[in-house]
Amino acid sequence: MHEYYRKNAPKFKKSMINLLKPVAPEVELHTGRDFAAVSEEIWRHYEKNMLAYFPYIGGDTVSGTKNLTGAYCFVSMGEVLKRYGVGMEEIGRLMTLAYERKMGKMPGFIGALLRKACKTPGLLDRIFVKKDAKNAANAAKNPGSFETKTVIPPEKGYAFSYHNLVCPLSEFAKAHRYGAYMPYLCNLDYVMFGVFGVPLFREHTCFEDGDYCDFKIRLGAKPLDAWPPVFAQGKGYK
């Protein structure tokens, strides 16, 4: 285990419980146990199988660390729920539900600001080009961390287009056989954008296609529902 994860384990445990607590009633129903007891079981799995093997990708200095550590809380929840006979689709539903309930508590002004920014694609381009440079500098120091590219001009039919070229979540899933979770983890992006009222569309993922994961915004479109999962809706999006 990298020293960063060892030192911050109490913080990660607190974050994990806060992330999963919104589906405490469903977890208790499936397991027949109190959420406090199940969350301890999930934490033990997470500490042993996730924290012990996570790559160091920049720690608190980069947002990607929170993406990696947060996403795999859901995977540990799923691995524990499997012990109680819960299937992958229901696990995916609980992942989506937990994130929806958590994101639903975000202040409304954040979504308003994001929607306003999306109506000014040039502003988004400038913001994300700076993020590309920051990610590239971090990746030079910490190989395997997120690498991104803002597509200018954006892909045809979209106001904004952004690619993840390297995704630590995908690489960790491949290395540790958590691939069944990746479509559901990617689907959580639709939860976040949907809560903010931003119409996200994706046709590529690093895990499935091996090239990049795209984030595309089409102004004036209706955000896709996050459940049933977008990849199962038959619209060609992932």
Positions of predicted regions on the chain:
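N-terminal, charged low-complexity regulatory/assembly segments
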Residues: M1-Y84
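Amphipathic interaction/junction segments at domain boundaries or subunit interfaces
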Residues: T69-A175
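Short, well-structured alpha-helical interface segments that form or flank functional binding sites
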Residues: Y72, S76, L188, G210
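Short, hydrophobic/π-rich interface segment
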Residues: K149-F207
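Short, charged/polar, Gly/Pro-enriched secondary-structure boundary elements
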Residues: L169-E171, A221-A226
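C-terminal edge-of-domain segments
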Residues: P199, C206, D211-L219
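Short, cationic low-complexity segments
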Residues: V230-K238
